[in-house]
Amino acid sequence: MTEADFKIRLFFLVQITNGVFVDFLASVWRHEKSRAVLLQVIVIAAVFGSFGWLISNLVTNFAALNKNFGFDFLFQPAGYDINQRLIEYTNRSTHIRAAVVGLLNTALVAIVGIVLATILGVILGIIRLSNNWLARNVAYWYIEFSRNVPILLHILLWHGIIINTMPHPKKAIAVGDFLFLSNRGLFLPQPIAEVGIAALYLAIVAAFAFVFFFSRYAKKLQRETGRQLPVSIINFIVLISLPLLAFLASGSPVSLDLPALKGFNFRGGMHLMPEFVALTFALSIYTAAFIAEIVRAGILAIHKGQREAAEALGLRPGRVMSLVILPQARRVIIPPLTSQYLNLTKNSSLAIAIGYMDLVATLGGITLNQTGREIETMLLVMSIYLIISLSISVAMNWYNSSVKLVDR
């Protein structure tokens, strides 16, 4: 075979192969499911290719800067103080300890903020539908003002109010001899665990476990037989009596460290910084405005015949709302409510604007600046916020599945 014959045969072979390949692609593209699979394969390949390019670029740049990738810096001394801490911490503690302190501060703001925003949002959502003209319009203007002002301005406003208008410690707003509010923050009694605290913890866990399983049993019994049990009364008695009995039997395993004014400030007790109070108020008030509209929409989604039927049975308006309207409205309220909880948690990262030492201020701020580990610290911050958000979503999805209608 001459070289010319070989080239001719190779040319025809390539043409035939290309034709077969083109026909194959055309047949795949015409088939809907095959086309979907092909597009997904292309997208996945592009994503992994881009990710691989980023990793390669990162390694090259790290080598050029004579830096290495790792998390060993977390075990080095932090060398800075944190103004509010829920666990023991000093400037000699490690960076990972500082990150945990910041994470707990973030979690504290998120939990307290979610509770306050939910309570305020539900109340405002109901008031928005009130027949009282003044109450309805006050709630309306509050919601419109809060929703249309950036959250950062809310935070700065409340911080300025607390710092500049709250009294000095000597003239602090007092509730009895155990709670004080001043421009230095909020001072509360701090519980101190003593010998026998394990029995109290066990009793609390057992009480909540009883409430959970008894409530499910009572609901199942009512659904199958129509018999109603006094669930609220029994649960309340168990929640109070079981821990109380354990407390008394263990010889008072918890003591209180009360705050007391000494000199120019309070000493002892639990100290919540003014930054925490301002941040929590701002996030709660801002998010409550959105929750109020969600609650209002959920109530309006319930057919008016439900209210009319309940009123025809002689139920008072408050009982109609709590027993008939809100239980049904939950199915509409919960999905968007989850988004607001996530927004509140993520908005707490703005705490750095007023000096509250949360996760972003500790791990994503001072630790980053001291160690120069930008990639590692940001990856950790992003991962932690992702875990928190997924945890909230899982909890709310579980609650949503427990209240949704079940098809028979």
What is each of the regions a protein language model found here?
Residues 3-12, 150:
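N-terminal amphipathic/hydrophobic targeting modules at extreme N-termini
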Residues 1-3, 21:
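Intrinsically disordered, low-complexity regulatory regions of eukaryotic regulatory proteins
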Residues 16-408:
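Transmembrane alpha-helices and adjacent helix-loop boundaries
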